[in-house]
A protein has these predicted regions:
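Append "and occasionally in soluble cytosolic enzymes with long acidic Gly/Pro-rich linkers
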Residues: 280-339
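N-terminal lobe/hinge region of extracytoplasmic solute-binding protein
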Residues: 37-81, 114, 183
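Gly/Pro-rich hinge or "lid" segments in bacterial periplasmic/extracellular proteins
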Residues: 66, 159-211, 216, 331-335
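Short, low-complexity disordered leader/linker segments with a strong preference
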Residues: 1-33, 70-73, 133-134, 330
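A bilobed periplasmic-binding-protein/Venus flytrap-type ligand-binding module shared by bacterial periplasmic
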Residues: 93, 202-205, 263-287, 291, ...
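Aromatic- and charge-enriched surface segment that lines or borders ligand/interaction sites
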Residues: 77-122, 138, 144, 278
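Ligand-site clamp/hinge motif
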Residues: 204-250
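Surface-exposed binding/hinge segments that line
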Residues: 80, 84, 126-168
Length: 339
């Protein structure tokens, strides 16, 4: 099943909740600060393995996603695709600076993607770029990628955070201290990191798309989902990503706003094909699949905040609804077992 989240805030299908009262009180003091209930981070290394909300605040990709989850410009203001040569050419924004003041160029892009592709670096993102056969820097603000085959998801993959070559060249891409003191091109800069307690970001006045409205964002480390809901209620948090059950508590409360949003979070019951049992009894697998009421699980566990999945990919613009799948059909399951 694909999980839908909700974000709720004090004044998400997982819900994000916003607490308007807390933020307004801080804004009245002159500096606007948002306190977000976050899971913990051991490092901030989007190119190798980390997935977190903090990445898109500190870093930028060549592309981004808009409010409808469609591909939009990022560090690349535009791009072209040559169907004959399977080549994407990206035209980069000019006058973009890293948080340390150094200029961003196409060399940073080439460095980042090649670092991800390098098997010695052990990046879990490497499979996204296995079709790339050549990366050519045309000039400081133009770069091309040639593929071995068409890849409909390539522009999505280019949302990958770009890293600064001048700070990471020659560094260990897994162990470098950079990933505890990251420098990006994003709308926020790292201000402080109190391990296990909070990560504080301040707005980047030189952000190439314009300085953000909120002056400071505090990622308060609250790993427990229940604790996030409690701290939303007490006003200790302004924003949190909550489970559907917890988000429902805030949906109708004055002073709170909940935002439903789709995620790529995936949950499934998988077969262990290393076990000889499934090799010997593979004929019963369809029967098991037909016997599982996925929608009932979504309704009971996620309060309906999710959708049935046919595989690990999102049912979005790339989805093929005609792919073979097993809808809930207990009678068909019984027929297979009795055959």
């Amino acid at each position: 099943m694909m999980l839908s989240m909700a974000a709720c805030g004090n004044g998400a299908e997982e819900k994000e909740t916003e607490n308007s009262a807390g933020t307004e009180a801080q804004a009245a003091g002159g500096e606007s600060t948002l306190v977000y209930g976050s899971n913990d981070y051991t490092r901030i290394n989007p190119a190798m393995d980390e997935h977190g909300e903090i990445n898109i605040l500190i870093f930028s990709g060549l592309t981004s996603h808009d409010g409808e989850n469609q591909v939009a410009p990022g560090l690349a203001k535009s791009w072209d695709y040559d169907e004959d040569t399977l080549t994407y050419t990206f035209h980069l924004e000019e006058n973009v600076k890293w948080h340390d003041g150094e200029p961003f160029t196409a060399d940073d892009v080439k460095f980042t993607i090649e670092a991800i592709m390098d098997p010695d670096n052990g990046s879990e993102n490497a499979p996204n770029y296995e079709d790339v056969t050549a990366i050519d820097v045309i000039d400081d603000h133009t770069i091309s990628f040639t593929l071995s085959a068409p890849n409909v998801a390539f522009l999505d993959y280019m949302t990958m955070a770009i890293l600064p070559k001048h700070l990471l060249e020659g560094e260990d891409m897994q162990e470098s201290d950079f990933f505890r003191h990251p420098i990006g091109t994003g709308p926020y800069k790292l201000d402080s990191w109190d391990a296990g307690q909070a990560i504080t970001l301040v707005k980047n006045e030189d952000y190439f798309k314009g300085a953000p409205n909120i002056d400071k964002i505090i990622f308060k480390i609250v790993p427990d989902d229940n604790a996030k809901a409690i701290q939303m209620q007490s006003g200790e948090l302004d924003l949190a990503l909550l489970t559907p059950k917890d988000a429902k508590t805030f949906a109708d409360q004055d002073g709170y706003t909940c935002y439903d949003m789709k995620t790529s979070d995936y949950r499934g019951i998988l077969y262990n094909f290393n076990n000889d049992y499934w090799t010997a009894n593979k004929d019963i697998i369809p029967a098991i699949n037909y016997a599982i009421d996925r929608q009932a699980i979504i309704d009971a566990v996620l309060l309906g905040q999710g959708m049935t999945a046919y595989g690990p990919l999102q049912r979005n613009i790339y989805n093929n609804e005609n792919v073979e799948h097993y809808d809930y059909d207990p009678e068909k399951s019984k027929e297979i077992l009795e055959a």
